[in-house]
Structures are given as C-alpha cells and as structure tokens.
Amino acid sequence: MALNACGWSRYSAALAATPYRRASPSRVPPLSSPSHVADTLITDRTQLVDYIASGEKPVQDWRIGTEHEKFGFRLDDLRPPTFDGDRGIEALLKGLTRFGWDPVEEKGRVIALTRDGASVTLEPAGQLELSGAAVETIHQTCVEVGTHLKEVKQVADELRLGFLGMGFQPKWRRDEMPWMPKGRYQIMKSYMPKVGQLGLDMMTRTCTVQVNLDYATEADMVKKFRVSLALQPVATALFADSPFTEGRPNGYQSYRSHIWTDTDGDRTGMLDFVFEDGFGYERYVDYILDVPMYFSYRDGIYHDASGKSFRKFLRGELDVLPGELPTLRDWSDHLTTAFPEVRMKKFLEMRGADGGPWNRLCALPAFWVGLLYDDAALDAAWDLVKDFSLEERHALRDGVPKHALKLPFRGGTVRDLAREAVKIAIGGLQRRARLNSKGVDESGFLDALIEIVEADETPAERKLALFHGEWKGDIDRVFREFAY
C-alpha cells in the first residue's frame, strides 16, 4: 500500500503545514446506512421542499464534504476480501477502532465506523468508503484523506490486505465479488436486474470520489446545479480511470461512468429539467417523488418497497407499511436513492469522477470548490456553459466515458474545455485565499489535473500504455504499482 502514485511528499508537507481540525459534524449520512434526521411525520408537501431549502447557508458557513471509495484486495492472490474471517472487512473495521473510530453494528455485525463527524462505510462488495467531515478548506480535506489512508494501511498490512483507487474493478468478475451483510443492499441486489443490465456492476465493481458543497439561496443553488451538471462530463474525462474489465481493456476510459447509463433510467442521468425556466426546490422535489422507492427503514429493519411510489407513501398507501405516513427520515433516505450526475439533498453532490490515488482525491474537491465557491469563478463557469444545448450536454455525457479528453466538441476537444475549466478553478481557489500555515493557497491541489491536461493523457490512458507496454498484458501489475 505504498503511496507511490499518491504523492507522499505532498501528503507529508500537508500534514506538517496544516493542523487538522474538523469544522463541523458531517452533513452526509452514509449511503449504506439509514439517515439520522428527526422522525417527524410528513403531513404536508411543503415539508419536503423545506427540508431541502433548510440546507441554505451563509457564505461563511459553507463547508466541503469529500467522499471516496476504494477496492480492497488480498496481497497473496489479489482477490477481494470477504466480510467474514481473520482477514475480512469486518476485521479491518474492528482494527481501525484503535484510532478512535466508534463501531456501528447491524444485526450484531460491525458494518461502519464513525469519528468526529466522519464515517467509514461499506459499499455492496466491501469497497471501503470514507465520508469525510464537513471542513473549511481543501488543506483539511487532504490531511483527512491522508490520515485515513495511513490508518487503513497500518491495519491492512497486518491483515495482508491492500487497497486500490480506480473507477472499476480491473480483474475480478461480478460473480467473484463478495456481498456485505446489509439489508439495504439485499433489496437493491434483487431490484437492479429488473431495471438495467449493469446495476449489479455499479454496486459491486465501481468506486468514485465525490464532493458535497453548499448553496446560499435557491438562486445560488440553481446556478451551481446548472454549472456542475454541464461540466460534470469534464470531471469524468479528467478523472477517467476505469479502462479494464476482467483483466483486459474494455474500450472505455471511464467504464464506471458508462455503467450508469444502463443501471436504472428512473434515477440516473443529466436532469434536463434543471436547465428549464422556473427550476428550483419544488421541481427537484417533483423529480424525487417520481423516483421509485427502494425501502423504508423501521425499528432496525429494511422493508422492501422497491418500485413503490413515494407519492403513495405520502397518502398512507404504501402496501408494505399500510396506513403509515412517511417521516422526514424516510424522505432523507429516499433522497439518497436517486443517482443523477449531480444530486441535491441539503447540499449539491458532484458524482461524475472515478476513484483514484491520493492526489486526485484532493484534486476533485479542489476542482469543484474553485469553480463554485468564488463568485467570479462561478460567473466564468456559467459563461462557459450557458449556451450549451441539450444535445451538446448529452453528447458530452455519452461521449466522455469512451473518449474522455479527446472527444470532439465545438471545433476542438473536451481537453480544451477542461483546460478552461481548470484555469477558472485555479483562479477561484487563489481568490478564496484559504492558506495553510506556510501561506500556501489551495490551488496547488489542482497540479494533478494540470498535468493530465497538458500531457493530454488521462489516468486510464496511462494505465493502458503500461498494460500494452511494460506490463505485457499482466493486469496484476496494476495492484502492485497503483495501490495506496
């Protein structure tokens, strides 16, 4: 688990220069766990709108919440660890408690950890996710991620495990992936094949890095939502790192991104309505109400409501809970079951990037904070995308999984668009002027993206070159050379 591809030198400098403190409790309930909002009964539709609107914050209270996932593997045979056993995922979670993490159990099994507003949770096949606390700066984000990776490395080494940051599992088949013992996932596992061909791959063989960002007003939310949706394909291209399936090139640079196009059309996509006149909280609530349910959580039990209507739930007509009305916790849970390229809960979640090494786990939040948390940068980003047609937005979304930076666009390529977006983000971070103790601002965290743009080589293309060259077609090399 050497951080050879992750930049230990920058990590060490960040640790030395930035006193790590969590600014506030995380606002991000883990995807894999029920939310913890009040069990207030919903008796009026306005409560649904008010719940989202309650996320509005003054600029001084804006925070950054970064999440990332990674693949575990056994060092001896590279197979993903199961949940059980001396070298299993539960053993890893229990080992991490030595660092002050509190265990979270489901039916007597440790399935998550919490500490100071952050959480460590499990994706369906045991992908390990850190949902970071809500912090003020990218410096703090990067130290948080680095500290987590260091803790995981210490325990994983003892268990002879390693971890890999990529967008898609490069070696193992879907039927070779383990399943975690979590009620929510069993419901999704049964439902996914009914609505798409690749949903089970999404659950078991993908990893991402995401950032959650705040808005001040409804108008601010709308502008940020539109900019981030239009530029999400640019992030997909820059972070493209999933070119292998079952040991061979799959024809994509971000196969993870492609998978979302055949997972579940009812809850994925580019949300064209966000660009329509009059878009706001009300319209987003209408969209979420039309997303079929997965479950309702009551007294420690996940009740299978897959395919059911939340609108019927509001009328007390949910057949698995007859006569019961939903609570705000049900609404909070339901908001997490939509998977568009950008998602709104009480904040906006950027969902377009593949997982990757440590430096790109810092670059992803830096990219979006630079674009969205500075007024001049947000204006410039909006000027860049405001005349994109619906057809162009979809062409970008559909084309970047395969072609990434080399996708033709308006007489140039997505690389040109990415160069301009990164330039805007750099300016935004410089004007934010959030300095570490050495007086360095956050713009340096975009160095990884500058290198990708200038080289015109995505992480996927780099790995493909190695695969066809130095590795001589041996996919096992990716585990040794790109592990954390």
Question: Language-model features: where?
Answer:
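Long, well-ordered mid-to-C-terminal structural blocks that present hydrophobic/aromatic surfaces
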Residues: 308-392
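Structured core elements
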Residues: 71, 210-214, 349-351
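Loop-rich catalytic cores of soluble enzymes, especially ATP-dependent carboxylate-amine ligases
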Residues: 157-158, 162-343
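N-terminal chloroplast transit peptides
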Residues: 1-19
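Short, positively charged and aromatic/hydrophobic N-terminal segments
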Residues: 11, 20-33
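Terminal catalytic/cofactor-binding subdomain
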Residues: 28-197, 205, 240, 360, ...
